């Protein structure tokens, strides 16, 4: 398949939660690149499941992860033999080391081929979710990022193309006592604090700070 391949949306694919594709009208035209973009930038559940089906279910994705040497990164949803893991962990599971390593390999043009690595990396630099870790980084610094969130777990992967050199990290929480979805959720406050600390560590001469009122603009106080 090519990114430009045309597809037709069917409302039978609706999956609630995050994302805008669930609101498409029946029969709406789309394409593979739009699905990939929505999956990455908007964490679109409907688009993600459609893509998972197109590539050959979660079992195929897990085979790719195995070939990439990722022992712990797996899709549990709609994947043969993963039901117990799905009941325990949900859609998928990973580790900070494997997820960060995967993004670094993408940055270094080592996934699939250089052109594919670049295309994937570009998508990751256009996330919709800027009010978490990215709110503590200058908007003029490119960041490849992906967020994940369910009630009791919040995660965020970043590779920051900082002026004095790239740095990458992954932060994830589990069994959260605070399962709220407001701007001041404890896990998101932690993610912001980590982002702020790492920026100060790697760019100690930077005088950039979030602008007054930025929190209110993003839905905070």
Identify the residue ranges that each predicted region occupies.
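Short, well-structured active-site flanking segments
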Residues: 1-14, 58, 113-116
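Structured C-terminal helix/loop/strand segments within mature extracytoplasmic catalytic/sensor domains
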Residues: 54, 58, 101-131, 140-142, ...
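Extracytoplasmic
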Residues: 2-4, 65, 70, 89, ...
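Short linear capping/connector segments at secondary-structure termini
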Residues: 12, 78-85, 139-140, 214
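Mid-domain, small-residue-enriched loop/turn segments at the edges of structured enzyme/sensor domains
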Residues: 28, 36, 49-103, 107
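Active-site-proximal beta-strand/loop segments in catalytic clefts of secreted hydrolases
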Residues: 11-12, 40-43, 51-55, 77-78, ...
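Conserved catalytic neighborhood of penicillin-recognizing serine enzymes
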Residues: 14-50, 58
């Amino acid at each position: 398949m090519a990114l430009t391949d045309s597809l037709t949306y069917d409302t039978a694919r609706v999956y609630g939660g995050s994302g805008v594709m669930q609101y498409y009208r029946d029969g709406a035209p789309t394409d593979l690149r739009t699905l990939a973009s929505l999956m990455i930038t908007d964490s679109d559940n409907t688009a993600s499941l459609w893509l998972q089906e197109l590539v050959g279910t979660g079992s195929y994705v897990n085979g790719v992860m195995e070939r990439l040497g990722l022992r712990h990164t797996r899709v549990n949803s709609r994947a043969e033999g993963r039901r117990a893991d799905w009941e325990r962990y949900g859609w998928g599971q990973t580790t900070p080391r494997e997820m960060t390593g995967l993004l670094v390999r993408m940055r270094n043009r080592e996934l699939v081929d250089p052109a594919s690595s670049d295309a994937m990396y570009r998508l990751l630099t256009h996330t919709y979710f800027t009010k978490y870790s990215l709110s503590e980084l200058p908007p003029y610094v490119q960041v490849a990022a992906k967020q994940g969130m369910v009630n009791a777990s919040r995660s965020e992967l970043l590779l920051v193309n900082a002026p004095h050199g790239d740095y990458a990290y992954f932060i994830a929480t589990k069994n959260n006592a605070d399962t709220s979805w407001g701007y001041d959720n404890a896990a998101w406050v932690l993610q912001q604090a980590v982002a702020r600390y790492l920026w100060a560590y790697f760019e100690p001469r930077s005088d950039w700070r979030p602008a007054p009122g930025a929190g209110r603009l993003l839905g905070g106080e």
